[in-house]
Structures are given as structure tokens and as C-alpha cells.
Amino acid sequence: MRRTVSTLLLLLFMVMAEAQNLTGKVIDSKTQEAIIGATVTLKGSKKIATVTDINGQFRLSNTTEGSIIRISYVGYKSLDVPFHNGATYRLCQDVAALGEVVVTARASNGPVTSSVIGRDAMTHLQPNSIADLMELLPGGYAKDPNMGEANTITLRETGTMGAYGSTTKNNNYSISSLGTQFMVDGVPISTDANMQYSPLSDTQSSTSSSTLENNRNITNRGVDMRSISTDDIESVEVVRGIPSVEYGNLTSGLVKIKKIRRAIPLTARFKADGYSKLFSLGKGLALNSAGNSILNVDLGYMDSKIDPTDNFENYKRVTGSLRYTLRGENDKKYLWQYNSAFDYSGSFDDSKSDPDINYGNVEEYKSSFSRLALTNSFNLKMPMSWFKEVDVNTLVSLQLDRLHQTRLVAPQRYGIVPLSWTDGENEAQAVFAEYTANYLCDGKPFNAYVKAKGVMGFKTTHTVHTIKIGANWDIAKNFGRGQVYDMHRPLSVSGWSSRPRKYSDIPALQNFSFFAEDFMKANIGMSKIELMAGVRLNTLLGLDSKYGMSGKYYADPRVNLAWHFPKFDVGGKPMSISLNGGYGITTKMPTLNYLYPDKYYSNFICMAYYDTENPTQDSKFVVHTYVQDPTNYQIKPARNYKWEIRLDVDWNDNRFSVDYFRESMTSGFRYSSIYGVYDYRSYDVSQMKAGVDYTTLPYENRRVLDGYQQVSNGSKLVKQGIELAFTSQRIHCLRTRVNVTGAWFHTQYTNSQPMFDAVSTVVNGQTVRNKYVGLYDWNDGRENDRLNTNVTFDTQIPEWKLIFTTSVQCMWMIRTKQMKKNGMPIAYISSEDGQLHDYTDESLNDPYLLQLARTYNDEQFKAFTVPMSMVVNLKVTKEIGRYMRLSFFANKILDYLPDYTANGRVIRRNASPYFGVEAGFTI
């Protein structure tokens, strides 16, 4: 008996020892090369799994000889075999699978209109940032990278244009990009507390210009896509239609970014083109043999020159990401997953003048953006229960932003520098010589976010319901020092209306939302119905009671419907047709800058005495300062009303989709002019001399009209258009698919509220704008059209591990016209009493008021059309063995750009080819 027990214990020990040390190797059956990253699982168990290492070897624990294992790898046929210790397993390539690498955006199949861009498409596209992916959307087109300015997003619109169809920037319509929400692994990238700008920019202005300060400023403009690298991204979904009520604080659309969370070999990427150099490293580690504990690490660096011949202006980006994933299950009763990530993103703009051509002086603009983010999420799924899912997401992020500007200020004769912080008459400083001004904007935007969601499900006789209920809260606060500079040496001596401001004194912004949604699926005969209907309630917590939004909730109802008709045969192949439609309201809350703008200091010159004998000592300058608070306590959220209809057709591996959409927003944010009456003294400078008290001089009381900028809901955007996408089956003799995307966009950019407009005409020696300013109820904007297509020939030769795509991008038409204006004001404000008065026929008899009536030539409102243009782009990807991938792209290798006439001038267009090469390594 004792011998029997000993024998059994010995056998058990041998089995356990064997189970702990079983190894194997996986290679390519044709090349005999090791396959890195192949998945090896014990068949019938998800807990026992591993991946092959750099040598193709793997180790399985808790497994015995003869157990059936499954070996799988992308592009190879899966292999189910008995497991033998030390054996070598050969995988055969799956040519069909290799030929189906998706290198374009995939259209959505559900009721919500969206496009999904996968990892393979990103690899083939060779992007510098997520901005480059937008060319894959319907209506998108390839652009040369411009890292010298913020890359903001526009969805389903033409973008603002100039008189001759050129792209412009316009602060009045920045809601387009501000209203696009970017989500990374379920948490948003918030820019609400970003106040990083220069007083020389047009941030708090209704005007826009292409200056250094404006091009790189993203305050109130949303996410700068330059800062988002694609190297650690698994997929990007761009929702252009009506999103689920789960997503809010948006108007235009949604960009959902999913990071890589799986075991992958060490990958390296090197890219170089005419503008940029890029490098990245990434690795996904399986921390246990079961493969359910994963650690992903990524690093990236990019250095871009705005002009390859100019070393004085560049942009740099540094990114790092550490992501942990843990999955578990309990006999299919519940599945859970915990995700955690620590991400760093740094963007660095640097521009300075060449001292050799700037008289030895250096003007410099440096802007740095460093974001640290800690995210956590927990997802619990209970497939067997009516309570299906619990999902919790959290985020804590801090940005360290610094904008430093050095500027040479050279007054013509003298410059007046007001120093007063309060209302009243004060002596001002004068500067008589050039000086170097230094400006610092120190921002520390902080954001915290919590979202909790529950999913329930139940069935009836004919329907299946999935109910989603949840809430989210976020807080945005800026703890920075704000605008720091020497008031005696401002960045400008011309109309300086700013003062230093501490951002940490600004209250926090808190958004709270609650949502509920039912996703119903039903069978009606042979047809299938999908109905997604829900509502989202939005409010701002902790807002001062002086604001009209305080305590108010704004409801966003949204509905999406998909009707899948019965399949029928065409040519012996089944055809499926679905009709989709939706309607919804989306809401974007104001940012910190819109709620708490900088004060405006209006300065009126009471006396400017310049002493010719001793100017620096005896000159005297007096100003009357008015401190304006531009806060609009009646500001409201921007709300967009959207509806669309879409037709999807699938037949024999061919897919066609076309949709028509219309969006209307009349409450977009913009800064508008506010006019009022200002009184000040004008001293008789002719009697002034050194040592005289200026208050004893005779003076004249003056009253003028002047204005400042206040945020309002005065922007109107109306979008409509048609989007189409077609993907053919692969033509096997050519190894090619044909992908066609295109769009017609018609967009109106105008105002939704009457606006003041001043006239500078002089009558009887008096400027009209000082006496009267008209209020006009006109359309001060443009109406734009754009029609373009992108035909891509996707050719893949799996045996050669070669993919090349040729895209023919045609811009068939760009048209723009100024909207007709009624030049007759509806009212005017008078300097006599500061009140609004109706503008009547009798007003035309007054020589001053007559000037307020504008007349326009009909030629101003004629449409201008830019003729058709075409470019051809080429991209090639070649795998070399198991470890290396080479890619090449050449944009605009062929072009058709005919000349055209604009305002009597011949415009000659030309295109400079843009080349780049990339090497990828898998180790």
C-alpha cells in the first residue's frame, strides 16, 4: 500500500512538473522563419493562453502532453493540433485573408452614420497625426501637413472661405471644431479650461487674421489634432451623424479613439518627409500565461519644420503611454475588464526671427503644451442576467501650458502706455524708444471626469430591448498664473486694452449630464428594425445665479432608425438594402473664456503733450480709462438641430452608401461689438508747458461712442449635403478593389442676431462713428459649396506582401458668394443719450444718419467659382521578411490645375509633389 501511494505521488509530481515546463515553437511553413506574436490557446479554455516571443517560442503552464491547442496569427490559417513538448508547429499563409487588409475607412452598418479607420489603414496611410486620417472620410482630401498652425477639425462642411474660394480662419464659427468631441478609451479630451493666448490674438474679437498668434491659438477652438499621434491607436471612429445620447457636450460630431490593448511584439517606426522626422516605439507585454493581463508601452517623437529651408520655425511633439489591461470571467456568468492608462502628450511651437535681418534683435514665440492624464475604467458584463452591463470611466488630467512671447516694440515718435486698473482720469506712461517686451501666459488646465453607465436588456414576443442609463460629471479649472508681463513694457503701444490676469482666480466649470436610451430590435415579417431613441439632460453646476443658464437643464432628444429590408437574389447573389434615418439635438456648453472673459480697458486720450526740448522728462500724457466687464450673463449653450437619411446596399461583396443630411445652428458662440457712451475731457494742449499742472488748463467735455467685444450666441451655421461611399468586390485578376468616396457640401456661415457696424465717414469735420452707430439686421456672411470625389484603387498582392494604392482626388467645384445685405439699419445708437432709436425715413434727412444707410453693388453678391482640379497620389507598403516593413508615399505625382480668372487677374495654380518614406520594424 505504501509503495502504491509513493508511485502515485511520483506520477503526480512528474505530471505537474511536465505541465509547468511544456514549450513549443511556431514558424512559417514556407520561409521557416519564426512567427512573433502568434496566439497559442488550450482549446476549450480561455484562461490558458500565451503568445510567441521574438524567437517564435512559447510556454504553456497547466497543460499536459497531448492536449489540443489552437495556434492562430493574422494572415495565417489557424492550426488545431495535439501539444507535444518541444515540438515545432508550422503555420500556412491564408492568401485570402492576407488579401483583405482594409486600407480605407469602413462605413458603419448600424443606424448611426460613422466611419471606422482601422490599424491597417493607418499603417498604410503613414500619418503624422490624427489630422491626416480625415482624408479617408467622405468629402475629405489629402493635404500637405502644416504643423505651423493648429490643426482643427471640420465635419460635413466646406470651412470658411475668402472671396475667391481660399480657406480662411474665422473666430465667429469656431464652434465647428469646438463642438467636435474627442474621446480616448471612453474619456473626453477637454479644452474648456484652455486660455493659452496672447493679447495680440483675435481670441476675444469678431475679427480674424492670419498672424502667428492666431494660427497657433486653440482657445475656444477645440482639440489641436497635431498633438494626437496615431502610433498607439487601434482604431478611430468618426461619428458624423446623430450620436447616441451617451455622448454629449458636442454639436458637430464625435471622434472615438481606441488605443491598442493587446500583446504585440516590439515595433518601431521611422518616417521622414520633406517637412518632418518621426520616430516611435511600442510593445505589448502579456504579463501572465493566461494572456489576460496586458501591459502596453509606447513612446513617440516628431520634429517638423514649417519650411524645410527655415530653421527658425518648427514644431515638436513628444508622446508616451503606459496602459494596463486585466480581463477575467466566471464560467460565462460574468465577464469583467479593468483598464488603466497614464498618458503624456507634449506639443512645442517655436518661432523666432532671424537676427541677421532684424537688426540684431530676436523676436520669439514659444508655446509649450504638456498634458498628463490618468484614466481608469471598469466594465462588468453579465450575459445571463437582465442587468447586462456596468461601465465606469474616470479621468484626471493636468496640462502645463506656457506661452512666451518676445517682441520688439518700436514707437514711431512716442507710445502711450495706460497703467490704470480703475475707471477715471490718470496720467499715462510714455515710451520714446524701442524696447523688448516679454509676455508670459502660464496655464494649468485641470480636468476631472466621472461617468457611470448601466445596461439592461429584456425580450418581448417580437422585440429585443437594450436600455442604457447613465450620468457623467466633469470639472474644468485653470490653476495657472495667467497673463504675466511688465505693464510698463506691453507687447504693443497701439490701443493696448489688456491687463495681467491670474487664471487661478477664475471659477471652475462643472458639467453634469444624465442620459437614458433604448435600443430596440424587432422583426416585422422578413424585415428587421433597429430603433435607437433616447434623451440627454445637460446642465452647469455651481454657476453663479447671475447667469441665465444657472439651474437650467437642456434636453437633447435623439432618434436613429434603421430598416433592413428582406434579402433577395440578384444574379444568384443575395442583396441587402437598408434605409436609415435620424433626428437629434446636440448641445455644447460655453468654455471658461466665454463665461469669464478678460476685462476690456477703454482708454481715451485727454491730453498728449510732447515737449520738444526735453521729451522724456517734461512730456505729459493723460488718459481717461473705462473698465469694461464683457461678461454676458445671458449666454446660452450652442445647440445644433440635425437630421439625415441614408441608404445602404450590399451585394456580392460590393457596398454602396449614400446619405443626405441637414444641420441648423443659430446659437453658435462669437464675440460681438457692444457700443456705449463715453465722456472725457480734452485739454487745450497749446497752453501746456513744462511744470504746469494740466488740471488748471482749459478743457472741452467730449462725448463719443465706442465699443468692446462681448461673447454672444450670434453665429448661424446651416449645413446640408450628400455623402457617398462605394467599395467594389476585389477584382481577382487585378488584385484590386475600387473605393469611391465623395461629398457635396453646402454651408451657410452668417449671423443670427442684429449687429452693430460703425461708419468712419467724416461729416462737417466730425467722424460719424463718434456720434452714431447703426444696428443692422443683415446676413453678414458667406454661402459656400464644395463638390469632390476620391477614387482609390486598392491593389494587394499577398504573395509578395505588397500593397499599393492609387488615389485620384478631384475637386469638381468650389463656389462661394457673399450673402445679400440689406444696408438699411433697423436702429441706431446716439452719443447724446446712449439709447437705441428706430431708423426711419426721417433719419435719411439727417446728414450724419444718412451715412448709416449702406448701398452695395450687385457684383459683390455674385458667386465666384473655382474650376475643377485633380491630383493623383500613390502609397506603397512592402513587407520584407517577418521583421521589416517599408512604405512610401508620393502626393500630387500627377495633377491637373487649370488657370482661372479672379477679379480680372489670372490665377495660375501649381502643385509641388510631396514625398515621404517610412520603415517599420517588428522585433
Model-derived features: where do they sit?
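Short, acidic, small-residue-rich periplasmic hinge/interaction motif at the N-terminus
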Residues: I27-T31, A38-K43, S72-Y76, H84-T123
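Short acidic/polar hinge/loop motifs at secondary-structure boundaries
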Residues: F58-S61, N172, V187-V239
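Gram-negative outer-membrane beta-barrel transporters
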Residues: M526, S682-K821
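Face-selective signature of the C-terminal outer-membrane beta-barrel domain
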Residues: G328-S347, Y365-K546, G721-E723
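N-terminal periplasmic accessory domains that precede
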Residues: G86-C92, I130-L133, N151-T154, M183, ...
